[in-house]
Each structure stands twice: as C-alpha cells, then as structure tokens.
Amino acid sequence: MKKILVGSNAFFKDFKGFKSKDKDYLVFIDNPEDFKIRKEICLRGIDMFYYKRLSPIEMINYTLETNDPLLIGKFLVPEVAEELKLSVTDILALEPMLSKLDEQHQYQVIIFNHIKNNNSFILTEEQLDEAYQFYLSTRKDKEK
C-alpha cells in the first residue's frame, strides 16, 4: 500500500521554517471493501485519505460532482499525477472550482496556474516559493 504525501507538506516540507498542523496522505485502493469512493481517517495529526483507484477522468468527474474544492489539491502533487497517469489537460476541468477555495488554500491556485502555464506538474523553485510566501501570509493573519 503506497502512501503519497499530499497537502501543503507535499509542496513545502523542504522550506525552512515550514510547519503544518498535520500530515495528509493519499492511498489508492484497487478494490475497497469498506467504502465506495473515498474514506478519511484522522488521528493525532495524520490524515489518511483512501480513494478507490479510478481512471483519471473518473477521478476528475467525481471531484466535480462532489463540488468540494478541497479535493483539487491532490491532483496538483506530481507523485499523484504520475500514479494516476494524469495530464495537465486532465486537470483543467477543475479550474472553475478554484474560486471556491478558502483563503488558506488559495496557494493551490498559484500552483495550479503554474502547472497550467508550464504544461507540467513540476514547478521551479521560484514558483514554489511564490506559493509558499502566499501560504505563509494566510497563516500569519490567522495567528494575530
């Protein structure tokens, strides 16, 4: 069972001073017995997201049907894209949902736009730093 690190840790774990309240992992299950499409288990700062392995189109369509913008982030992680054999074109259908992200997840809009412009899930250090600086700005305001 392969665990893929997702969420802010997937992008910013190597940045000096980065701290996250939790770690999110994504696991794909070929034939789940105790859930239909997804299941989430949170325990002591570790959030496990289990998904039935679907085709890229089915995964995108499921995300669109749920209308939950927080599901977008997993598609931006290069390891997830590789595991699902996603193309940049595949994720473009999710673009209208970006406007529904809350402020603390708006860094994903920056990442999405860079992926789109690069036509690649691999970002430059400068692009990741831009997203990280935005990420930090949304957290600092909440601490005051």
Which residues does each predicted region cover?
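Catalytic cores of NTP-dependent nucleotidyl/adenyl transfer enzymes across multiple folds
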Residues: 45-144
